Amino acid sequence: MSDPHRGAYTPPTDAPLSFDARQPVRGARPLPMTLIISAVVLVTLVVAVVMIYRDGVRGPNDAPQAVGTEVAQMKTPPAESSQPKDPASGLQIYHNEEPQPSATFAAPPETPLARPVAPTATTPVETASLPAAKPAAPAPTIESLATAAAAQKPAPKPVQVAQAAPKPVAAAPATTATAPKPAAVSTGPASVQIGALSSPALADKAWAEAVRLAPGLAAGKGKKVETVDKNGTTLYRTSVTGFATREAAKAFCEAIAASGKSCFVK
């Protein structure tokens, strides 16, 4: 520990010179002015807050303060003219048009045609006319009997004239019915696929039904059935062929699609 009686200019000794914080300072300790000022300021703020709070908030037994002026009691409803009017009322911004039904492209009903009847071969029938009946002989008289007695002389034999035998009438050749020629099948490049069926019978049925739905557009068109193996299952892809243009095939597809059938143009 340092010697308190050593001065600043005292020559050093063998004793170590060190600072001891526990060594008392000479004279009286100064007052903590900063702490005192902080306490005074804090007390002042607390007093100010308490006074402001008590002045702005009513007591527990005080009635609430009235805000604004009192409203008189309304005995009758206000007139419509006194109510504010919306300047945009009555304006029609959008047109309330009734929705029009969309056009449905359905095939017209098919007109049944008369089945062609083959003409039957008729053989001409020969008719023979009966000979004319001989007139009845008049009653004999005396003069006629005398004339007959005088005429009972052998008359000369008549000369027999050979008459030509009538030629047999040749029978008219029987007319045979000619089968109607099948309508020519169009061979256009475009086609419409109408489905992939599980059997040839269903494929033929689907083709016939598609042609029936649009007979005018499918007139003279062909049928094409392709065998396709898909995932171990054999399908029969059916198409209506022979359309001259892609537009004609598209029109046929739209006509049968309007009846609920699926198709696409190839």
From Swiss-Prot:
Do you know which InterPro entries this protein is assigned to? SPOR-like_dom, SPOR-like_sf
- Low complexity bias locations: 112-136
Q: Does the keyword Cell division apply?
A: yes
The residues exposed to the Periplasmic compartment are 54-266
Q: What is one term from the GO cellular component aspect held by the record? A: plasma membrane
Q: How does it sit in the membrane?
A: Single-pass membrane protein
Write one Gene Ontology MF term. Answer: peptidoglycan binding
Q: Does the keyword Cell membrane apply?
A: yes
Residue ranges in the Cytoplasmic topological domain are: 1-32
Q: Which residues form the SPOR domain?
A: 184-266
Instruction: List GO BP terms, alphabetically.
Output: cell division
Q: Where are the transmembrane segments?
A: 33-53
Region of interest (Disordered), ranges = 1-21, 71-136
Compartment(s) where it occurs, according to its Swiss-Prot or TrEMBL record: Cell inner membrane
Keyword annotations for this protein, in alphabetical order, are: Cell cycle, Cell division, Cell inner membrane, Cell membrane, Membrane, Transmembrane, Transmembrane helix
* PROSITE patterns reported for this sequence: SPOR
Please describe what this protein does: Essential cell division protein.
- Domain comment, as recorded: The SPOR domain is dispensable for cell division, but it consolidates the position of FtsN at the cell division site and the cell pole.
- Subunit and partners: Interacts with FtsI, FtsW and the cell division inhibitor SidA.
Q: Would you tell me the protein name for this molecule? A: Cell division protein FtsN
Q: Which gene encodes it?
A: ftsN
